[in-house]
Amino acid sequence: MAEQPAGQAGTTDNRDARGDREGRRRDSGRGSRERDGEKSNYLERVVAINRVSKVVKGGRRFSFTALVIVGDGNGMVGVGYGKAKEVPAAIAKGVEEARKSFFRVPLIGGTITHPVQGEAAAGVVLLRPASPGTGVIAGGAARAVLECAGVHDILAKSLGSDNAINVVHATVAALKLLQRPEEVAARRGLPIEDVAPAGMLKARRKSEALAASVLPDRTI
């Protein structure tokens, strides 16, 4: 068997290693694009980014925290709090935590079902349903939660602390207190017409009819 020169063998090995690196680079790029495609299905809002420090024996170690809201714009929303040495990593951790804490918000015609007040630490947020066309009347932190949840018409007011973290958690606490008219009617043993206003029921029937008319187009 003919022996291959040492120089030629080294060149072949270098080419193989270079090809492996290029293949891994292409695969990693494809994976990042796929992850970007997954993220595009959700609404993401970064409410606050803070730089924090930890005092250790050798001095101070700085890191960043990010408060992130993630929702599908159709009743699902979650809140995440990420911490890392770099801002993008902190946001990514916040997004991952927010997706793990998803919960469903009962909506009728783009607004909430009834007035509710949520409290978290020193934060107090009051939410009231609004008529179509009102819009989201809320501050920055509460607005991010409501928009990601898919609320289009609502009146919100902060009655406590102005801290963004407290306001966000108070808003989430208020949304988790919402109940559907069917639940209240079943608990009281009454028909739903005696529990929910006629305008609310009409708006729900209209939204259900609209969703039913759009659904066949999405399945094609």
Swiss-Prot record:
Skewed-composition ranges (Basic and acidic residues): 13-39
Domain S5 DRBM per the UniProt entry, residue ranges? 42-105
Q: Any idea which UniProt keywords this protein has?
A: Acetylation, Ribonucleoprotein, Ribosomal protein, RNA-binding, rRNA-binding
InterPro entries linked: Ribosomal_Su5_D2-typ_SF, Ribosomal_uS5, Ribosomal_uS5_bac-type, Ribosomal_uS5_C, Ribosomal_uS5_N, Ribosomal_uS5_N_CS, Ribsml_uS5_D2-typ_fold_subgr
- The protein's superkingdom reads Bacteria
GO CC aspect terms: cytosol; cytosolic small ribosomal subunit; plasma membrane
The molecular function terms in GO held by this entry are: rRNA binding; structural constituent of ribosome
Matching entries from Pfam families are given as: Ribosomal_S5, Ribosomal_S5_C
The job of this chain, per UniProt, is described as:
With S4 and S12 plays an important role in translational accuracy.
Q: Which PANTHER family match?
A: MITOCHONDRIAL RIBOSOMAL PROTEIN S5 (PTHR48277:SF1)
Query: Subunit info?
Result: Part of the 30S ribosomal subunit. Contacts proteins S4 and S8.
Q: What is known of its domains?
A: The N-terminal domain interacts with the head of the 30S subunit; the C-terminal domain interacts with the body and contacts protein S4. The interaction surface between S4 and S5 is involved in control of translational fidelity.
Stated family: Belongs to the universal ribosomal protein uS5 family.
Q: What is this protein called?
A: Small ribosomal subunit protein uS5
Question: Which species?
Answer: Mycobacterium tuberculosis (strain ATCC 25618 / H37Rv)
Upper lineage is: Bacteria, Bacillati, Actinomycetota, Actinomycetes, Mycobacteriales
